[in-house]
Amino acid sequence: VGLDHDHVWGLLGAIAKEPEAELVAIADPHPELVDKAKQQVPAEVKFYSDYVKMLDEAKPEAVIVTTANNRHLEILRECAKRHIHYSTEKPLASTAADAREMERLANAAHIKLMVNYWNAWAASTHELFHRVYAGELGPVQKIIVQYGHEGPKEIGVSKYFADWLYDPVKNGGGAIVDFGCYGAEWALWLKGRPSSVFAYSLKLKTAQANAVDDDAVILLEYPDATAIIQASWDWPYSKGQVQVFGPKGSLLATGDGVLYRAAKSQADVDHPDGQPVTLGPVPHETSNPIAYFLYCIRNDKPIENPVAASLNVGVVEILDAAKESIRTGRAVKLPAN
């Protein structure tokens, strides 16, 4: 459902490579995007301008949603009525109220609800998570997450994607949502729910006529830890990494690998953040979003973190609290679940 999110083209490629996946229909109202999709999918795939008509006529078992964040609830409501499993690109929704309602509807309809993050399938992500949970660092005391790039327009996103990415209602914000969600995802997964949220944001590209931030910092407070989230559309290059510290050492995960540095170890000139860790193979069912979504549906397995609905309701609650903190200039207490 939707072709106006540029991640859709990678997902169509993943569907084509997945033996268990059959693409039956696509819904999007933009003729230019439909023409592009027709060049990339089998001829028997049906196209609709109205996604509700598609749900009724094509009767899919599951949908992949790739459109504006503020439409996620509306589309899930229609899927829940028809008991159709639902996966969407991050974040789960543009507001916490929408996210909570999506989880409620999915649970009531007994359908799978998944939120796709690209980092969830990386070998470096799996390795860092398992080492942290195995206690290799001791109790997590600090998490530093940095996700960003030069900016949507600067990296050449489509005009259809840009139309809603730069809209504070359709997206829910700017960089604070687009990349801040990764930091909230990591923090909730590795440390749990914070007690308070403080944030500030900037509009560095003042010449661009849009109403969203392009640089943000979010500070999450825990009784025994802090998490610092840096999200930006202003960096000179693309970057996505998380660094975790505990009394026994630190781990740094990038898209390319994991570095480990033990407590009291001497810094290595070639590897100041630690020594490279050998990454094990990722099982096929957790190697990409299509394979995992189908695996959970076919085997009636629950969607697990970090792509599960419950954690991602928390992600959007953190983002809402961050935006409220920016508005008031004060830290926002986050109620316990």
Role assignments for model-derived ranges:
Residues 1-42:
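N-terminal Rossmann-like dinucleotide-binding module
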Residues 101-119, 139-141:
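Rossmann-fold dehydrogenase core element
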Residues 119-209, 329:
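Predominantly a Rossmann-like dinucleotide-binding segment in NAD(P)-dependent oxidoreductases
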Residues 33, 45-105:
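Beta-loop-alpha module in the N-terminal Rossmann-like domain of NAD(P)-dependent dehydrogenases
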Residues 62-64, 292-337:
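C-terminal helix-rich "cap/oligomerization" subdomain common to oxidoreductases
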Residues 6, 32, 278-291:
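Active-site loop of classical SDR/Rossmann-like NAD(P)-dependent oxidoreductases
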Residues 184-258, 289-302, 320-321:
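Contiguous beta-strand/loop segments that form the cofactor/metal-binding neighborhood of enzyme cores
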